[in-house]
């Protein structure tokens, strides 16, 4: 399985002949190396409804026929307002089997809304995501602050990789993310959600260097991938 990082919180997972795109914020994101019109994933997974995470989901899903996996409130909105047909609604605590493996949604401490036609629309609870693919567990924290039940996520799902936001201001910063890494005890920690905008400017290498002894961190450059 190959996992690549494409700026902000966008990652791509390729397992066998299946491609999964997570939080595809592409258009308007100078830090992303992808082009929305070229993406043909089989699945799109969304952590929450903010524009810098839903991103180009509607265009990509309509072009590719991808199934969109997300919380049920966001799924309903995308179906009714944007005409998406292949939706897989879930909610926090639930898990579901797909052709590529299992998805389980966890809590995240953040918001989830958009502005449509001048009105603010609440899009349900934000989530983290635990993928179980090829007998590997990948935790994608989404946008969140630090919370102590991250210990439980790590205990219930021994993690091979954890993607953690470090940008501060809108999510936990590097200091809290280092504590999150301690709680989760993943084999590998990858920072995300930083340097897209001035408000979330961070040094990811400094974050990796701050991790507790025994915790391995890796900064993925834009377009870089790991294989697990």
UniProtKB/Swiss-Prot annotation:
Disulfide bonds: none annotated. One of its GO terms (molecular function) is hydrolase activity. Keywords: Hydrolase. It holds the Pfam family Lactamase_B_2. It comes from the Bacteria. InterPro entries: Metallo-B-lactamas, RibonucZ/Hydroxyglut_hydro, UPF0173, UPF0173_UPF0282_UlaG_hydrolase. Transmembrane segments: none annotated. PANTHER family: UPF0173 METAL-DEPENDENT HYDROLASE MJ1163, UPF0173 METAL-DEPENDENT HYDROLASE MJ1163-RELATED. Belongs to the UPF0173 family. This is UPF0173 metal-dependent hydrolase LMHCC_0991.
């Amino acid at each position: 399985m190959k996992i690549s990082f494409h700026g902000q919180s966008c990652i791509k997972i390729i397992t066998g002949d299946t491609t999964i795109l997570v939080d595809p914020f592409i258009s308007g994101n100078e830090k992303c190396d992808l082009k929305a019109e070229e993406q043909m994933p089989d699945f799109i997974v969304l952590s929450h409804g903010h524009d810098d995470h839903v991103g180009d989901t509607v265009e990509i899903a309509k072009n590719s026929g991808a199934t969109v996996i997300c919380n049920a409130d966001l799924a309903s909105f995308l179906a009714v307002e944007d005409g998406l047909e292949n939706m897989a609604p879930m909610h926090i605590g639930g898990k579901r089997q797909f052709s590529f493996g299992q998805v389980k949604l966890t809590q995240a401490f953040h918001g989830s809304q958009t502005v449509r036609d001048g009105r603010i629309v609440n899009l349900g609870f934000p989530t983290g995501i635990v993928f179980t693919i090829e007998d590997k567990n990948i935790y994608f924290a989404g946008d969140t602050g630090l919370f102590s039940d991250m210990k439980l996520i790590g205990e219930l799902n021994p993690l091979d990789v954890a993607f953690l936001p470090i940008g501060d201001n809108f999510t936990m910063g590097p200091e809290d993310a280092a504590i999150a890494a301690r709680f989760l005890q993943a084999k590998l920690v990858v920072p995300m959600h930083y340097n897209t905008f001035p408000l979330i400017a961070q040094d990811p290498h400094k974050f990796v260097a701050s991790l507790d002894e025994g915790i391995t961190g890796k900064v993925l450059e834009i377009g870089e991938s790991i294989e697990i």
